[in-house]
Amino acid sequence: MNFDPRKSAIADMSPSFATLVISLMILQGIFMENPDDLAAGIEITPQFERFSQRNDVFSRAFWDDTVRSAASQAFFASYRMETIPRRGDGFTQKDFALRNASWLISDIMTDRFAADGRREGFQAPISNDTPVAVEKVRFETPSDAAANVKKAARFFGADLCGVTGLDQRWLYEDRVDVRDMSKAPLGLPEGLTHVVVLGHEMDQELVRSYPSALGGAATGREYSHEAAIVMQLAAYIRNLGYQAVASMNDTGLVIPMAVQAGLGEYARNQMVITPKFGPRLRFSKIFTDMPLEADRPKRPGVAKFCDICTKCADACPVKALPLGPPKFGGGRSAIQGVKKWTSDAEKCFSFWTKLSSDCAICMRVCPFNRDFRSWPQRLWLKLALSPARGLALWFDRWRQGRLKPAQWWSRP
């Protein structure tokens, strides 16, 4: 069910009166969670608020003096101009050169309408270059339609594809006009009913080199890949006669959408752990009115493993990840009214600015960061998702550690 804005008024009531009102709303069928919330591991309160993208830490770096600094400005500039290389391994000129080149296709797409205030793919949905066909291609069933879209997604290069109904709780309250960082309407068309969520695997060897500018090339490459893939798949759906809006980090929170689409389970490091690639993915999405059969969320046991594992939090240099159980709350850059593991976004981003590159140590050290194509790793996964998860955590001590960037360059 879509988020009902009437719930926000409950936050201002006394606890006893709020309980009475909620009880009446439940009897009237007004206050209802999405039926799949339990299966997805999503728990919300009446204090739930849709997230304003203006409060995203990357947006705040342009208008909020508690985040904006000379270091943050240098961080963003380093992706678009010649940076001052360091002597340290992983931060040489060739490391930054590879990282910046990996972002090229994404940057070209993002810059197309920046002069109009639309930083597409990050702070605005991607504009459509393909008109919707007048005649619709009809499929016998929504299941057939979903299978067709997934086939096309694999052809274009997506590593994972799932479908979920459009849950408006995860849409941003507004987008950002990058000309002055003011709030702007999302601009989604009416009638959208489903979200096609795509997963894009990051290079495992480069991820092993984090923290480094070289490791940042793994992120940039997938943003460039996903920009092409999500635009191509959206064009295909529009050619079939249905609305399709391509989206990357913009427009809505893709993590809960990926969970609802059955692609994986939410983890302590705030990532989606997938059965094929662990946390080593980027996600994109397409909003559409195409009648599709939605996938069901799955909870194989990742959260239970995270309950006993704190490797990501322990490894974080600035201690931005939580050690305790999931809880409500969080800072300005966190969605409110959702019980989950939440990072300190300000601490995390401050470390990025010190590196002049992104950091994914929490991804690298995650025990699920493995190549599950091999049978020993698949066996470990079964153990990790079983009541013997503690034994799997003990075995993780023998997993490969960090790869020195110089080693990556020296390999054939």
Residue ranges of model-derived segments:
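Long, compositionally biased charged/polar accessory segments in the mid-to-C-terminal portions
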Residues: 394-412
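Catalytic cores of enzyme domains
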Residues: 150, 156-373, 378-386
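Charged, compositionally biased interaction regions
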Residues: 378-379, 384-395, 401
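Non-catalytic, usually N-terminal nucleic-acid engagement modules in DNA/RNA processing proteins
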Residues: 10-206, 212
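Generic secondary-structure transition motif, activating predominantly at the C-termini of alpha-helices
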Residues: 109, 113, 352, 387, ...
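Extreme N-terminal basic, low-complexity initiation segments
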Residues: 2-8
